[in-house]
Curated annotation (Swiss-Prot):
This is Dolichyl-diphosphooligosaccharide--protein glycosyltransferase subunit swp1. Pathway: Protein modification; protein glycosylation. Residues 1-18 form the signal peptide. The chain crosses the membrane at residues 591-611, 621-641, 647-667. Keywords: Endoplasmic reticulum, Glycoprotein, Membrane, Signal, Transmembrane, Transmembrane helix. GO terms for biological process: protein N-linked glycosylation. Glycans are attached at N142, N558. It is found in: Endoplasmic reticulum membrane. Subunit of the oligosaccharyl transferase (OST) complex that catalyzes the initial transfer of a defined glycan (Glc(3)Man(9)GlcNAc(2) in eukaryotes) from the lipid carrier dolichol-pyrophosphate to an asparagine residue within an Asn-X-Ser/Thr consensus motif in nascent polypeptide chains, the first step in protein N-glycosylation. N-glycosylation occurs cotranslationally and the complex associates with the Sec61 complex at the channel-forming translocon complex that mediates protein translocation across the endoplasmic reticulum (ER). All subunits are required for a maximal enzyme activity.
Length: 685
C-alpha cells in the first residue's frame, strides 16, 4: 500500500514539475515589426525641426528640451545641434528660477547631465547652494509623491556628476530612507500610488515614478530596511499589471506616456528585486513592444521621448529582450527555392546570433495537414547577416505555405527562443513585370528616368520620399506564361502602424496603374504623415493569390491629421411604415355595433314585456350552481367589453380560457339540476 502511495505521489510531483517547467520554456512568436534605421532618421528629423533658434531650446520650454535631448542621446546622436547654446540657456533658466520650481530644476539638471555639461561643474554654478539644499529637503519631507521622486533624481544626478558639495550630501542622505517610508505609505491596496495621503486613490503615473525612484534608492543605499519596503511594493506588482488593456497581440496602460513610464519603472524594479521577473512574462514584454511599435508616427516631443525610452528598455533589460524574424523575400519562383532567406534582429533591427530550424512547412490552405518537410536547419551568411535554406529538392508546388521557424538565440540570458510562422508564396502562374514607381510635379513628366524607380518582382524598393506638390504613379504589368494577364482583383495597399487603405488599380492597354496626388492620399489616409508600406494584391480564381510588399514611401501632408473613429457618425435612420388600410365609413361601423348589441337589447326589451318570474328560482345546491353559472356568464360579457375598450386579444384569450373552467362546471351542474327537476315534475303529473 505504501509503495502505491509513493508511486502516485511521484507521478503527481512529476506532473507539477513538468507543468512549471513547461510554463517557463513556453516560446513566443517574437515581434512582428522593428524600429529600423529609417525610423530613427525620421525621429531625428522630427526633433531637429522642433529646435527654436531664438530661444536656443527644443519646443517651447525647458520641459520640451528635456524630451528632445532625451530622445537624441538615447538613439546615439553624439553631435547634437547647438549643444553649448542649449546648456547655456538651461543654466540661465536655473539661475533665474533660484531653485524654487522642482520640475524645472529636474528638467534642467537632466538636460545638463545628458549633454555632459555638468562635468567639472558644481551645483553652485547653477544657483545658490543653500537654496538647492532647502528645495531638496523641503520636497523630500513635505512634497507630493512626484515632487519626492524628482528631488531624488536631481540629487542622484548631481551626485553622479560630482556636482554637489559634501554639506548637501550630509543633509540629504539621512532623508532618503525617510522618503522611502513616506512613498511606500502612499501605496494603495491595489498597488497604485497616491500623490498625497489625502487622495482617494492612486494612479499609474504616480506608480511609475515611485517604481523608478525606489529602484534607484535600493541600488544606491544598499539598506535592508529599504529592500524590505521595496519587496512590499513588488508584492503588489501583479495587481498593477492586471489593470492593463490587452488585445490579441498587444498590452498597454491607458496611453503611450503611461505605458512607457510604467515599463521603465517595472524593469528598474526588476534590476533590484528578482521577484519582478516572476510577475512579468516574456509574452507581456513582447505585447508591450508590439504596442510601442504601432506608435512610430509621433506628433509631439513628449510622445517621441516616451516611445524611445520604452523601446530602449525593451531592447536592454534583465527579464526578456524581444526579437524579430523577418523574411528577406516572401515570394519565390520554383527556380529560386535554393535561396530562402530570413533575418533575426532585436527591436532596433540589430542582428542577433542564433540558430534557426524550419520546424515544419504546411500548406496555407490546410494548416493541419501533414508537414511537407520538417527539421530543416538554416545556415548563417555573414555577408548580409541572414540565414539561408536550400529547398529546391523538397518538391514544393505552386501555392502559399506556412513556414514555422524555431529561433534559438546564442545569448539565452538576454533573449528567449521564439517560434514564428511566416507565409511564403511560390508562384509561377503569374509574374509582375515593369513595376515602376514614379513621381513628378506634372503628370506629363512622370516618365522621366530621374524620378522613376524600378523594382524586380519579389524585391523591394528602398524608402522613397514623395514631395507634397508632386503627382505619383505606380505602373506594372501582370503576365502569365509571357502573355498579358487581366486578373479579377488587383489593388494597391498603403499601410503603416496607424493607417491602412486599399485602392484598386486601373487596367488599360495590357497594363495596370494607379495615379494619385497628395490630396488623394490625404483623403484615403486621413492626412496622417509618415512612412507607408506598399503592397500589390492580386486575386483571381484561376491563380494563386499574390501579395507583394514592393516598396515604402514617405508622405507629408500640410493638413492636420483626421482622427480615426471606430464608430463614425452616420445619417439618421428614417423608417417607412406601411400605409394603414382605408377604414370603412362611419355608418357601416355603427351598423355593425348595433348588430352586436342587438341580442342584449332584445333581452332587455323582452324582460319589460314578459316580465320576470323569480318564484321558480332554485333552492339548495341548485341556487349555488345557478348563481355561479350566471356569474361566469356575466364575467365573460365583461371580459368582452374590456377587450373592446383597451385589452389585447392575447390577454383576453388567456383570461377566457381560465374562465371557461368554472363556466362549464357551473353550467353543467345547473343544467343537470333543471333536468332532474323536470323529470320529477313529469312523474308527479
Amino acid at each position: 500500500m505504501k509503495l502505491i502511495i509513493l508511486i502516485v505521489l511521484s507521478i503527481l510531483i512529476s506532473i507539477v514539475i513538468s507543468g512549471s517547467v513547461q510554463s517557463k520554456i513556453t516560446t513566443t512568436r517574437g515581434i512582428s515589426n522593428v524600429y529600423s534605421k529609417n525610423d530613427i532618421n525620421n525621429i531625428k528629423q522630427f526633433i531637429s525641426s522642433k529646435y527654436n533658434g531664438n530661444t536656443k531650446l527644443y519646443g517651447e520650454s525647458l520641459k520640451d528640451t528635456f524630451y528632445g535631448v532625451g530622445v537624441l542621446t538615447r538613439i546615439g546622436e553624439t553631435n547634437i545641434e547647438a549643444t553649448k547654446d542649449i546648456c547655456k540657456q538651461t543654466k540661465e533658466q536655473l539661475k533665474q528660477n533660484k531653485f524654487t520650481d522642482i520640475e524645472l530644476v529636474f528638467n534642467g539638471v537632466t538636460i545638463l547631465s545628458e549633454l555632459k555639461c555638468l562635468q567639472g561643474e558644481s551645483s553652485s554654478s547653477l544657483g545658490n547652494e543653500q537654496q538647492l539644499q532647502d528645495l531638496l529637503k523641503n520636497k523630500l519631507e513635505n512634497g507630493s509623491l512626484l515632487e519626492k521622486t524628482q528631488a531624488i533624481n536631481i540629487y542622484f544626478t548631481l551626485s553622479s556628476a560630482k556636482a554637489i558639495d559634501s554639506k548637501t550630501v550630509s543633509i540629504i542622505d539621512p532623508l532618503l530612507i525617510q522618503a522611502v517610508n513616506s512613498m511606500v505609505s502612499l501605496m494603495d491596496e491595489d498597488g497604485t500610488f497616491k500623490s498625497v495621503s489625502t487622495d482617494d486613490e492612486g494612479n499609474l503615473q504616480n506608480t511609475a515614478a515611485a517604481y523608478f525612484a525606489l529602484a534607484r534608492l535600493s541600488h544606491r543605499l544598499k539598506s535592508n530596511e529599504v529592500d524590505k519596503l521595496v519587496a512590499k511594493v513588488v508584492n503588489k506588482v501583479d495587481t498593477v499589471l492586471a489593470s492593463a488593456d490587452e488585445t490579441t497581440d498587444s498590452l498597454y496602460f491607458n496611453d503611450l506616456s503611461t505605458t512607457s513610464s510604467l515599463l521603465h519603472g517595472l524593469l528598474s524594479l526588476a534590476s533590484v528585486n528578482d521577484k519582478v521577473a516572476d510577475v512579468i512574462s516574456n509574452k507581456q514584454i513582447n505585447q508591450i513592444s508590439e504596442y510601442l511599435l504601432r506608435q512610430k508616427n509621433v506628433e509631439s516631443l513628449s510622445d517621441a521621448y516616451h516611445l524611445i525610452v520604452a523601446l530602449k528598455r525593451c531592447q536592454k533589460n534583465s527579464i526578456s529582450q524581444p526579437i524579430s524574424l523577418a523574411l528577406v523575400k516572401s515570394i519565390y519562383s520554383p527556380s529560386g527555392l535554393n535561396d530562402i532567406r530570413v533575418r533575426v534582429t532585436d527591436i532596433f533591427d540589430q542582428p542577433i546570433e542564433a540558430s534557426i530550424v524550419i520546424n515544419k512547412v504546411v500548406s496555407s490552405k490546410n494548416p493541419r495537414s501533414t508537414p511537407i518537410l520538417s527539421g530543416k536547419e538554416m545556415k548563417f551568411q555573414s555577408s548580409d547577416n541572414s540565414f539561408v535554406a536550400d529547398l529546391s529538392n523538397e518538391n514544393l508546388k505552386l501555392g502559399s505555405y506556412n513556414f514555422e521557424f524555431k529561433v534559438q538565440p546564442v545569448d539565452t540570458d538576454s533573449y528567449k527562443s521564439i517560434t514564428n510562422i511566416q507565409i511564403i508564396t511560390i508562384t509561377g502562374a503569374v509574374t509582375v513585370n515593369d513595376m515602376k514607381l514614379s513621381y513628378a510635379p506634372k503628370s506629363d513628366q512622370l516618365g522621366s528616368p530621374k524620378t522613376t524607380n524600378e523594382v524586380q518582382f519579389g524585391q523591394k524598393l528602398p524608402l522613397i520620399e514623395i514631395p507634397s506638390n508632386n503627382i505619383a504613379r505606380i505602373f506594372f504589368r501582370i503576365a502569365s506564361e509571357a502573355q498579358p494577364y487581366q486578373a479579377q482583383q488587383v489593388g494597391i495597399r498603403f499601410y503603416s502602424p496607424a493607417r491602412e487603405a486599399v485602392v484598386p488599380a486601373t487596367y488599360s492597354a495590357d497594363a495596370y496603374s494607379y495615379t494619385f496626388t497628395n490630396k488623394d492620399a490625404c483623403k484615403i489616409l486621413g492626412c496622417q504623415s509618415g512612412n507607408y508600406q506598399l503592397d500589390l494584391i492580386i486575386g483571381d480564381q484561376s491563380i494563386t493569390p499574390l501579395q507583394w510588399n514592393f516598396g515604402e514611401i514617405n508622405l507629408k501632408f500640410n493638413q492636420s491629421t483626421i482622427p480615426t473613429n471606430r464608430y463614425p457618425e452616420q445619417l439618421p435612420i428614417s423608417h417607412n411604415f406601411r400605409v394603414a388600410e382605408k377604414r370603412p365609413p362611419q355608418s357601416i361601423s355603427s351598423l355593425f355595433t348595433l348588430l352586436v348589441l342587438s341580442p342584449i337589447a332584445i333581452f332587455v326589451i323582452g324582460l319589460l314585456f314578459v316580465g320576470t318570474n323569480l318564484g321558480r328560482f332554485p333552492t339548495g345546491m341548485g341556487f349555488i350552481y345557478t348563481i355561479g353559472f350566471l356569474g361566469c356568464i356575466s364575467a365573460t360579457g365583461l371580459l368582452i367589453v374590456n377587450y373592446w375598450l383597451h385589452s389585447t386579444m392575447d390577454v383576453t384569450l388567456k383570461n377566457l380560457a381560465l374562465l371557461m373552467i368554472p363556466l362549464v362546471f357551473f353550467g353543467h351542474k345547473s343544467m343537470s339540476y333543471y333536468s332532474n327537476l323536470s323529470s320529477s315534475n313529469i312523474k308527479k303529473d
